[in-house]
Amino acid sequence: MEIDAVPMSDTPRKILVTSALPYANGPIHLGHLLEYIQTDIWVRFQKLRGQQCIYVCADDAHGTAIMLKAEENGVTPEQQIAQVKADHERDFADFQVNFDNYYSTHSPENRALSEMVFQRNKDAGYILEKTITQLYDPQKGMFLADRFVKGTCPKCKSEDQYGDNCEVCGATYTPAELIEPYSSVSGATPVEKETTQLFFDLPKFEALLREWTRSGALQEQVANKLQEWIEDLQPWDISREAPYFGFEIPGYPGKYFYVWLDAPIGYMASFQNYCDREGLSFDDYWGKESTAELYHFIGKDIINFHGLFWPAMLDGAGLRKPTAIYSHGFVTVNGAKMSKSRGTFIKARTYLDHLSPEYLRYYFAAKLSSRVDDFDLNLEDFAQRVNSDLVGKLVNIASRTGNFVKKFGGTLSTELDNMMLVREVQEAGPRIADFYEKREFGKAMREIMALADHANVYIADKAPWSLSKEEGKEQEVLAICSTAINVFRLLVIYLKPVLPALAERAEAFMQVEPLTWADSEQLLLGHEIAKFKPLLSRVDMAQVESMLEDSKESTPAPAAAKPKKAATQKADAADNDETISIDDFLKVKLRVARVAKAAHVDGADKLLQLTLDVGELGQRNVFAGIKARYAPEELEGKLVVLVANLAPRKMKFGISEGMVLAAGPGGDDIHILSPDSGAEPGMEVR
């Protein structure tokens, strides 16, 4: 649901915001941080505008993985989650992520609310009991989830594959289909064993989910994806057998709530804890008739839980559903999946040991949009953009003019030299607010930096450093520099959701109270400021390289209990930049093709269907993942490069007969490679 920025009024909006709960079995890394920084920026914007916006989160503290991790570390699960929670809170605080309440799912509030949601759904007839067969570890005396079973893929015969899908060939299967399965917990051969489990009757909510997923509460890409699930809704297993770290289900001794039942209820529990402390009404936000706004920020990997199970469970329990769920993509580094061997699997603490959190907050903001596209952290671009935008543009305004104000008495003039420039910056405020509201942070940053460019051009044209040497020009210099400081102040207000610490330093320099969005309507005239001190240092690529090196060193060597699987061997080869022979390269046949027709693909988030004219080779049908970057009408008539001898691939939407070459990390940052004019369809690319 997209909401236009609401004009500031005397009646603030009541907003509750959550981020997905980080799992309490390991440290925060940069892939996690994208979501928390995105959410924090949006929340800070709302608060800066005077809204009553509450941001809660918690550690996801239950499950088999935490129980086993605690056992591995020689501590109790309670000790394990307490230490991890402290580490998480420290990392979030140092990245300036400001929760109103940070809690744990292992809490009395979460137990009570989980039992309430379960019992209400049970009373309404939405809980089933079914006897099923599962794999069981006879050595550990426990049932095994799919991801705790490994073996040889039944399709491609790759070893050491998980019990639900093969990472080498992509095949999906059941754990029972694995060849030579073994428990990744003990190494024992699992056996099949019957067990009676509890299920949430999700198919009963099909009509509700069809309506709700198309109500505007989800991004279009997410809503389209969830339709695939809705076509085949199945009862959802919500119980696990002992031994298990979590909450035992009342009336079912030895059975525990599955972590994905009590984890989202953790949002409610953290808010309940906040309400008890602050004297707020829980029902005002979660009751069926609540008029408060409720937003969940999540990653695209958990949209099924939040977009299907969660609203259905809430409805079954007589509670309200979210106003909207905002999903984001995965983080890549330098165009590739985060890699421990390359040092790009960067922990939050390792980053903080080398670089300012403000750099990452700004870079995330500068590239984030409201879409679900993956996010590439290109480290060279990261350094260049921070240095250019923040140091070279924003801070430069104050550094070039602040000391001239001090030189001529330290007080800003009562009249400005260029009111047209100042009004231009003020009038941009509503547009920037609208971008923030719609999570189009990248557009907001581009607008702000364009204004900073205008200010720097103005300063360069006026050259106060030259005028200051001329006798009798003091008041003119002061008016020029006062104009620049007023523009700087406005830009700081607009950037405050992204850079709260820099804003605080700027407020100290300007000697003003903490700025709010409403302050953008006023000017700073006849006001004394402090001596300018550097507000931000430049990114040094040596710091970045040192961070990457430390990320490599901090990665423990993998256990050698099993031979390397095929996927790992392939990854190692890629890490070593393995070369190929010219004969290998010549096997790939590249041809010039012209896009005869381009069209959207119904039900596909990323694909366009291209009909390509390949000269004497005839026409080819190709599905290309370029929808985020190109409209169909932009492509028709365009020359492209086609991999012409790629085996046809059967896809859900049809047969793809080749691949179009493109550059870039993906999403809306992708660029089709196009031959020079003169090339003709069918020509071979050499």
UniProtKB/Swiss-Prot annotation:
Coiled-coil residues = none
- Please indicate if the UniProt record lists Nucleotide-binding as a keyword: yes
Q: Which domain of life is it from?
A: Bacteria
The reactions it catalyses are: tRNA(Met) + L-methionine + ATP = L-methionyl-tRNA(Met) + AMP + diphosphate
Entry keyword Ligase: yes
> Which residue stretches belong to region Disordered?
547-573
Annotated Gene Ontology cellular components are: cytosol
Per UniProt, residues of the tRNA-binding domain are: 584-686
**Residues reported in the UniProt entry to bind ATP:** K340
Chief location: cytoplasm
At which positions is Zn(2+) bound? Answer: C153, C156, C166, C169
State which Enzyme Commission number(s) the record gives.
Answer: 6.1.1.10
Q: Where in the cell is it found?
A: Cytoplasm
Q: Please give the NCBIfam families that the UniProt record associates with this protein.
A: metG, metG_C_term, PRK00133.1
Q: What does this protein do?
A: Is required not only for elongation of protein synthesis but also for the initiation of all mRNA translation through initiator tRNA(fMet) aminoacylation.
Identify its protein family. Belongs to the class-I aminoacyl-tRNA synthetase family. MetG type 1 subfamily.
Quote the protein name from its UniProt record: Methionine--tRNA ligase
Originating species: Alcanivorax borkumensis (strain ATCC 700651 / DSM 11573 / NCIMB 13689 / SK2)
The root-end lineage is: Bacteria, Pseudomonadati, Pseudomonadota, Gammaproteobacteria, Oceanospirillales
